[in-house]
């Protein structure tokens, strides 16, 4: 899963 793509501004 790519969480960074869903929330790149974390």
From Swiss-Prot:
GO-annotated biological processes: neuropeptide signaling pathway
List the signal peptide residues.
none
Key words, A-Z: Amidation, Neuropeptide, Secreted
Among Pfam families, the record links this protein to: Periviscerokin
Task: List, alphabetically, the InterPro entries matched.
Answer: Periviscerokinin
Per the record, its GO cellular-component terms are: extracellular region
Where's it found, cell-wise? Answer: Secreted
Taxonomically, the superkingdom here is: Eukaryota
Claim: Secreted is one of the keywords in the record: yes
Q: Which residues carry this modification: Leucine amide?
A: 10
Q: What does this protein do?
A: Mediates visceral muscle contractile activity (myotropic activity).
Q: What protein family does this chain belong to?
A: Belongs to the periviscerokinin family.
Q: What is the protein's name according to its record?
A: Periviscerokinin-2
Organism, by scientific name, is Polyspilota aeruginosa (Madagascan marbled praying mantis)
């Amino acid at each position: 899963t790519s969480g960074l793509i869903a929330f790149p501004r974390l």
